[in-house]
Design a protein with these regions (language model features):
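Conserved catalytic core of the tyrosine transesterase superfamily
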Residues: 1-144
Length: 144
C-alpha cells in the first residue's frame, strides 16, 4: 500500500542561518570547536551533503582571489563521477567559511589528506576522514 500511494520520508528539521550562527557563537577556540565551526560553515555555504564534506581532501581545494573552489570528485547526484566545482566566497563577518576552514587547517597542521578528521579524547587529530555518521552526531550534539 505504501508503495502504491507513497509516503513522505521522515526528514530532519533544516538548520536555518540564524540557528547556525547561534550554534557558532557558542563555540570557543579549541581544536574541536575550530573543526566543527569550519565543517558547519563550509557545509552551509557550499550546500554540501555529509558524504561530500567527509570526502573532501586538501588537494580538492583551489585558492582564488574571491575565496576557495572545491572540486567534488563524486557525489550522489554525479553518478558518472565527472566531478563538479563549488565556489565558496569570503564572508564579511565572523561567520566566514573560508576563514574558519583556514583556521582549522592551520591549528590542526593539515597539509594533505582529508580536510575533516576525528580528534581523539586526548586532543590529537587523526589521519582518517570523519564519517558521515560522525558529522550527524556532531551536528546533533551542537544543536541541542
Amino acid at each position: 500500500m505504501k508503495r502504491k500511494h507513497g509516503t513522505a520520508q521522515a526528514q530532519a528539521k533544516p538548520l536555518l542561518r540564524d540557528d547556525l550562527f547561534h550554534v557558532i557563537d557558542q563555540m570557543g577556540e579549541s581544536l574541536r570547536d575550530r573543526r566543527d565551526r569550519a565543517l558547519l560553515l563550509m557545509g552551509f555555504a557550499g550546500g554540501f551533503r555529509r558524504s561530500e564534506l567527509v570526502g573532501l581532501i586538501v588537494a580538492d581545494i583551489e585558492t582564488v582571489r574571491q575565496g576557495l573552489v572545491f572540486t567534488l570528485r563524486a557525489s550522489k547526484t554525479d553518478q558518472e563521477r565527472a566531478g563538479r566545482k563549488i565556489g565558496i566566497p569570503y564572508g564579511r563577518t565572523r561567520f566566514c567559511p573560508v576563514t574558519a576552514l583556514e583556521a582549522w587547517l592551520n591549528a590542526a597542521s593539515i597539509k594533505e589528506g582529508p580536510l575533516f578528521r576525528p580528534i581523539t579524547r586526548h586532543g590529537n587529530v587523526t589521519q582518517e576522514a570523519l564519517t558521515g555518521e560522525a558529522v550527524s552526531a556532531l551536528l546533533r550534539g551542537r544543536v541541542q
